Amino acid sequence: MSAIGVIGGTGVYDPSIFENIHEESLMTPFGEIDYVQGTYHGKTVIFVARHGKDHTIPPHKINYRANIWGLKKLGVTFIISTTAVGSLNENFKPGHFVLTDQFLDFTKNRITTFYEGGDRPVAHLDVTNPYCPELRDILQKVGTEQGLTIHNGGTYVCTEGPRFETPAEIKMFHMLGGDTVGMTNVPEVNLANEAEMAYSTISMITNYAAGISEAALTHGEVVEMMGEMAAQLKSLILGAIDAIDVDARYDAHDRMHEYGGFKL
């Protein structure tokens, strides 16, 4: 039976929103992952805390390949991920939600693919639509019905971290078309696509990026805003889980057909 995966980012560690939960671990070829399995209205849900349940893993140290491989092994076909982001776009204000549709990759030291030769062919992932349009539409519909300010579309700039960005970097990202900035969406989105899972990110605007606002950036500010948005996020995720047809097949589920499909 197909499952829905939820990857919780900063401030999103509470799997108790689901039913029949139990904690498990799984060894993958890339290391061990911890996860929580539960149900919601009869659908199987797998929850992974991206930074660890105690927020001990910084963005550049996250084992992205283990997380995605593990979710695939557990039968996940849809992934809803959450990210806390800064805004480069004056129309995307703190407290708003953004359903990212494109990204700019400014990471430096991360392994971004499962396809490194050896047992796998040389493969070139098509990322024309890296964030599943059908899943984004579901989230947009649910969010709008719930009265959220939710933007369907936006370009996420992913930086290496763990430091925040300089005002000069933010100015450059804005000139390149960036709308939000964060540290975790790449390579997660690429790996999910290689593993042929429909993937969408709910980005929560927690602050304006450096230089957009004159105030200094703090992690505490991010966590505080996440706390304020937590109830809305919970309702959005649960509403989306209700709306997802786990038997549906989208382009994302056949992303690697040219290479014989993704094999564990």
Name what the model sees in each region:
Residues 1-128:
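Metabolite-binding pocket within alpha/beta catalytic cores that recognizes anionic/polar moieties
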Residues 68, 170, 186-189:
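Generic hydrophobic/aromatic pocket-lining and core-packing "Φ" positions
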Residues 72-75, 174, 193:
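Non-catalytic positions within long, well-ordered alpha-helices that form the structural scaffold/packing
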Residues 77-78, 179, 198:
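Short acidic/polar active-site loop segments enriched in Thr and Asp
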Residues 130-175:
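Active-site rim beta-loop-alpha module in soluble metabolic enzymes
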Residues 183-221:
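Zn-dependent metallopeptidase/amidohydrolase metal-coordination segment
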Residues 210-257:
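His/Asp/Glu-rich mid-to-C-terminal helical/loop segments that flank catalytic regions of hydrolases
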